[in-house]
Amino acid sequence: MGKLIKYISILLIVVLVLSACGKSSNKDEGVKDATKTEASKHKGGTLNVALTAPPSGVYSSLLNSTHADAVVEGYFNENLLTIDKKIRPKAYIASWKDIEPAKKIEFKIKKGIKWHDGNELKIDDWIYSIEVLANKDYEGAYYPSVENIQGAKDYHEGKADHISGLKKIDDYTMQVTFDKKQENYLTGFITGPLLSKKYLSDVPIKDLAKSDKIRKYPIGIGPYKVKKIVPGEAVQLVKFDDYWQGKPALDKINLKVIDQAQIIKAMEKGDIDVTNDATGAMAKDAKSSNAGLKVLSAPSLDYGLIGFVSHDYDKKANKTGKVRPKYEDKELRKAMLYAIDREKWIKAFFNGYASEINSFVPSMHWIAADPKELNDYKYDPEKAKKILDKLGYKDRDVDGFREDPKGNKFEINFKHYSGSNPTFEPRTAAIKDFWEKVGLKTNVKLVEFGKYNEDLANASKDMEVYFRSWAGGTDPDPSDLYHTDRPQNEMRTVLPKSDQYLDDALDFDKVGIDEKKRKDIYVKWQKYMNDELPGLPMFQGKSITIVNDKVRNLDIEIGTDQSLYNLTKEA
């Protein structure tokens, strides 16, 4: 009975929230948020930061950590390259020069950069990090990022004891030779955060992700070093006096996992200074607060979709198996998208901090297709019903829900990860409501985040339809998520035409350094995927950070030169 009451209450929230969308008179509508705080030269003090989700504890993004883990890692470790405002690579700790474009490249790292254990960052650390990804015992998702390095395949298969395409010139320089020329040889290359060879080489690679050196005592080269970790709850950091750009402005940073429904209250009380990865609902509450809270927002590379696990998958062999036919017909998927009022759904649960998307590429990227070239799948429940009727999905037993074309019961099993975000349940229930209005019986289930990821990684039999959001990077190429047999291709799509487009867009012999040629191919891919709909594009989001009136030197815009070591809080 308790579960039933809870579920009814969720549906009631959905009805109230969605019906209120058309009547909004939010006083902040149309007000543009800032992207940065004021500047200050203040030194010292402690910054308290809210984590909106608990980390799993794998504090290395090379070892297949979650977004929450990567957020923590960002406070104590750094990338070797950064990006400019056009999302292009920019020299930082490392610089590069082409020896033979797309075939051989030389990297140099700065001298004198220290790991938190006092050892100097060397080119051996970079080589070691790449060898971890190419090792046969590596269980993460990023081997495809290094497999085009000459000799990586032999090393991966145990036929060689080193990767022949990695040539150490000296302690700060290496040359990398690739098997075949690919246009994203730089943006797709592993440029950090790295693993320390001296610190970790005594740990078997198969045990790295579960080792204390990663989970309890991780080290990096960033401005703050880890002092204490309370698993799933908190991370304490202190300034690293030997940081390569100078002593950081703050003395300490405390990261605390806070229930999302309580974050604004914690900020109003002064317990929290900064909340990254904030939601639209938090931003709305912050703007109505009298505690001097400030909302920063900027365009991001985040987007969300509803996916379909289309094939069986052998994770150990990394091979896609037989088709799962339930959602095989793209017309069924189109009907499911037409049935969703995405505009209303986004207004209800993102409070203006997201917009509809019809592509699998965020519009910020230079390869993004013009929206006018894509079917926008505007909400049209009558069209959805007509498609379903034509396909043979009809309500034969007059129970209000459609059976499949063979007359069998048809139910959508839709999953979403659980967490402290109070919108997860109502926004999932809203999708259920949209689908059931066109006669598609839907079961929804929220699953613990770790198990959810594991089920997707293994294409578990009970994982059918699911929600996922992705954050893009400097490399706009979407192959990792949509190319057949890529570990991160959670939908397990097998679309030869899609694969061919993606391969052609990286083929240096076909596109060279001509970005227009490359973009033209990606636009063709987006048009194809927009028609094929292996998943349902839902939204692209904004980056939201909430701060109190004491935080200084924070800029969240992509490509900013503002560094974490300058971040400070006035007394």
In which residue ranges do the predicted regions lie?
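Aromatic- and charge-enriched surface segment that lines or borders ligand/interaction sites
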Residues: 95-142, 175, 266, 326-327
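Ligand-site clamp/hinge motif
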Residues: 209-215, 240-286, 441
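N-terminal lobe/hinge region of extracytoplasmic solute-binding protein
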Residues: 50-100, 131, 219
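Surface-exposed binding/hinge segments that line
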Residues: 143-202
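Append "and occasionally in soluble cytosolic enzymes with long acidic Gly/Pro-rich linkers
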Residues: 326-433, 524
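Gly/Pro-rich hinge or "lid" segments in bacterial periplasmic/extracellular proteins
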Residues: 184, 189-248, 252, 262, ...
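Extracytoplasmic/peripheral linker and loop segments enriched in polar/acidic and small residues
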Residues: 38, 334, 346, 441-452, ...
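Long beta-strand-rich cores associated with HINT superfamily self-processing modules
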Residues: 547-571
